[in-house]
């Protein structure tokens, strides 16, 4: 295996990281790897607490891809066992525990989604239940003896909960130990994670040392702020842009980020800036709107294609900017001649509930043809001539009465 020089590798690896523990150790590992012609083992774990990956996950996945491109071995761990514990990192209360079935089901699509960034041919995928579920209670007791309660309470989230008398369950103390055992089992050289994973990564480093294994280098990456501009990107907070979003949704949600996040998103999410040598900060200062549109096109092109990115932009301009219906709407036909507006919206799955539908009607967010509907008891007349129903900013439906057959 031919690797780039140690300096070249370090420059790429350290770029955009928050912390490397430690750079000297990483340099020694890279030097040994180069001398022996053997790749380093790079570990990244992901608990399948939800079935969708979002752009926040892509930050560490891109760093793992950089290691792949440098010739090293990428190991992606699907934490189907640790997901049953629930990672307490950054949480102010105990997380719900998943069943084994839920964890496995959520994990099924993780590798497929991660392969939009990683090279699947050069990625080793593991499920940590394969080794953690084999441990006996005596093994857990021996493992627990390597760490103290005082050491656990050093982590910020546990310390805050302890001082505020918010309950901390014993199984939460076991989470970093279980994640650390992944590193003991794999004997990996490097582990990647977000800044909220620092404590867990360091536990893995300590446990490797305790078990006579050369300690891993820990590399932390920034946590991506979500579209709301304030909280860490999270599906549960509604501020996420997901890998599996439609091209139109991905484009629109990217344009919804505050201008203050454009540079961060560019640096963390776009590996190669597209044919423009001007520094991104200068481009944002000159024309933030166009730079954000370019960012949105870049992201859609990464996860779909340049053609889909162009279509997504055209859709956004037509529907959001010019407030016109999409040109490719299928017609949804109903047998009824009239329908109460709330029932019609529910039949179209325009909103998740009747209460939400009523609220949106009262806010003036529902339109039939050119007429804004403000009465929640309004009745929509359906004829064989289709009418466009607009629900919210981005949802359009073409509805008509089914033609009678004789």
UniProtKB/Swiss-Prot annotation:
<protein>
    <recommendedName>
        <fullName>Tyrosine--tRNA ligase</fullName>
        <ecNumber>6.1.1.1</ecNumber>
    </recommendedName>
</protein>
<dbReference type="InterPro" id="IPR002307">
    <property type="entry name" value="Tyr-tRNA-ligase"/>
</dbReference>
<keyword id="KW-0067">ATP-binding</keyword>
<dbReference type="InterPro" id="IPR036986">
    <property type="entry name" value="S4_RNA-bd_sf"/>
</dbReference>
<dbReference type="InterPro" id="IPR024088">
    <property type="entry name" value="Tyr-tRNA-ligase_bac-type"/>
</dbReference>
<keyword id="KW-0436">Ligase</keyword>
<dbReference type="GO" id="GO:0003723">
    <property type="term" value="F:RNA binding"/>
</dbReference>
<dbReference type="Pfam" id="PF22421">
    <property type="entry name" value="SYY_C-terminal"/>
</dbReference>
<dbReference type="GO" id="GO:0006437">
    <property type="term" value="P:tyrosyl-tRNA aminoacylation"/>
</dbReference>
<dbReference type="GO" id="GO:0005524">
    <property type="term" value="F:ATP binding"/>
</dbReference>
<feature type="short sequence motif" description="'KMSKS' region">
    <location>
        <begin position="232"/>
        <end position="236"/>
    </location>
</feature>
<dbReference type="InterPro" id="IPR024108">
    <property type="entry name" value="Tyr-tRNA-ligase_bac_2"/>
</dbReference>
<comment type="subunit">
    <text>Homodimer.</text>
</comment>
<keyword id="KW-0547">Nucleotide-binding</keyword>
<dbReference type="Pfam" id="PF00579">
    <property type="entry name" value="tRNA-synt_1b"/>
</dbReference>
<feature type="domain" description="S4 RNA-binding">
    <location>
        <begin position="339"/>
        <end position="401"/>
    </location>
</feature>
<dbReference type="GO" id="GO:0004831">
    <property type="term" value="F:tyrosine-tRNA ligase activity"/>
</dbReference>
<keyword id="KW-0694">RNA-binding</keyword>
<comment type="function">
    <text>Catalyzes the attachment of tyrosine to tRNA(Tyr) in a two-step reaction: tyrosine is first activated by ATP to form Tyr-AMP and then transferred to the acceptor end of tRNA(Tyr).</text>
</comment>
<dbReference type="InterPro" id="IPR054608">
    <property type="entry name" value="SYY-like_C"/>
</dbReference>
<comment type="similarity">
    <text>Belongs to the class-I aminoacyl-tRNA synthetase family. TyrS type 2 subfamily.</text>
</comment>
<feature type="short sequence motif" description="'HIGH' region">
    <location>
        <begin position="48"/>
        <end position="57"/>
    </location>
</feature>
<keyword id="KW-0648">Protein biosynthesis</keyword>
<feature type="binding site">
    <location>
        <position position="235"/>
    </location>
    <ligand>
        <name>ATP</name>
    </ligand>
</feature>
<dbReference type="InterPro" id="IPR002305">
    <property type="entry name" value="aa-tRNA-synth_Ic"/>
</dbReference>
<dbReference type="InterPro" id="IPR014729">
    <property type="entry name" value="Rossmann-like_a/b/a_fold"/>
</dbReference>
<dbReference type="GO" id="GO:0005829">
    <property type="term" value="C:cytosol"/>
</dbReference>
<keyword id="KW-0963">Cytoplasm</keyword>
<keyword id="KW-0030">Aminoacyl-tRNA synthetase</keyword>
């Amino acid at each position: 295996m031919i690797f780039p020089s140690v300096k070249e590798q370090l420059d790429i690896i350290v770029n955009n990281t928050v912390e490397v523990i430690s750079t000297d150790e990483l340099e020694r590992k890279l030097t040994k790897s180069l001398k022996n012609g053997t790749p380093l083992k790079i570990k990244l774990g992901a608990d399948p607490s939800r079935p969708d990956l979002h752009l926040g996950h892509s930050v560490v996945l891109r760093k793992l891809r950089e290691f792949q491109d440098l010739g090293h071995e990428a190991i992606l761990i699907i934490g189907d066992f640790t997901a049953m514990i629930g990672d307490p990192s950054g949480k102010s209360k105990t997380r719900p525990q998943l069943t084994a079935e839920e964890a496995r089901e959520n994990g099924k699509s993780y590798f497929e989604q991660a392969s939009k960034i990683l090279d699947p041919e050069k990625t080793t995928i593991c499920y940590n239940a394969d080794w953690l579920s084999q441990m006996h209670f005596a093994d857990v007791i021996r493992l627990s003896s390597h760490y103290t309660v005082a050491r656990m309470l050093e982590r910020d989230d546990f310390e805050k909960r302890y001082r505020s008398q918010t309950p901390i369950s014993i199984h939460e103390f076991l989470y970093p130990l279980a994640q650390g055992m992944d590193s003991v089992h794999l004997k990996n050289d490097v582990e990647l994670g977000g800044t909220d994973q620092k404590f867990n990564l360091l536990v893995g480093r300590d446990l490797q040392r305790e078990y006579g294994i050369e300690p891993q280098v820990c590399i932390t990456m920034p946590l991506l702020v979500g579209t709301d501009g304030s909280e860490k990107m999270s599906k549960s907070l509604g501020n996420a842009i997901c890998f599996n979003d439609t091209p139109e949704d991905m484009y629109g949600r990217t344009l919804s980020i505050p201008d203050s996040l454009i540079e961060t998103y560019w640096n963390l999410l776009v590996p190669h800036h597209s044919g423009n040598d001007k520094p991104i900060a200068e481009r944002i200062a000159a024309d933030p709107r166009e730079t954000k549109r370019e960012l949105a096109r870049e992201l859609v092109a990464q996860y779909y294609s340049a053609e889909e990115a162009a279509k997504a932009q055209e859709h956004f301009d037509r529907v959001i900017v010019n407030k016109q219906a999409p040109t490719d709407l299928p017609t949804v036909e109903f047998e009824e001649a009239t329908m109460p507006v709330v029932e019609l919206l529910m039949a179209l799955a325009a909103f998740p509930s009747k209460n939400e539908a009523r609220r949106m009607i009262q806010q003036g967010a529902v339109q039939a043809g050119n007429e804004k509907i403000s009465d929640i008891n309004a009745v929509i007349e359906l004829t064989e001539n289709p009418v466009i129903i607009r629900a919210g900013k981005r949802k359009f439906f073409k509805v008509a009465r089914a033609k009678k057959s004789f």
